[in-house]
Amino acid sequence: PLIRETLSIGIPTLIVTFVSFATTSVQSSCSLSVNPNGASITYYARIWYILPYSVFAIPITTAMFTELSSFVASGKIGKFIDGIADGCGQILFLLIPFAMYLIAFSPCLSNMLKSARMSSEDVQMLSTYIAWLSVSLPFYGVCTYLQKACSSLRKMSLFAIAECIAGAIQIVICLV
C-alpha cells in the first residue's frame, strides 16, 4: 500500500516535470526564431523573475506544506481549505508588489545583465520581456503552491492533468 501511495504521488510529479521540460524547450526554441539572442534574453529574464519567487514564495510554500499535510492527516479538511486560502493570500501579498517592481525597474535590471554580445536593441527586448513576464509572477507563485497543496492531499493526478492541458496550450501558442 505504501509503494502504491508513493507511486500515486511520484508518477504524476514526474509527468509534470516532463511537461515543464517540453514547454521550456519549445519556448527557448521559439525565442531563437524571433531573435538570435532570444535564448539569452529569456535566460536573463528568468533570473530576475525567479529571484522574488525563490526568496519569498518558497519559504511560505514549504512551511504551509507541512501544515496542510498535518490537516489532511488529521482529517481537518476545513482547516486545509483555510490553509490554502491563507497561503495564497500571503503569496499574492508578497509577489504582486515584486511583480510591479520588476515591471518598473526592468530597464535598470536588463542594463545590469547586458553583455558585450547584446546590442542595445537586445537589451530593450530583455527589458520588455522582463516586464511582460513579471505579470505572471503572482500566478506562478500560487500555481506552485497549489502543486504542494495537491501533494499534501496525496492526489497529484488532478494537478498533472491540469499541467498537461496547460503545457499543450503553451506549446500550441508558441508554435502557431
Report residues per predicted region.
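Membrane-embedded alpha-helical bundles of multi-pass transporters/translocases
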Residues: 1-176
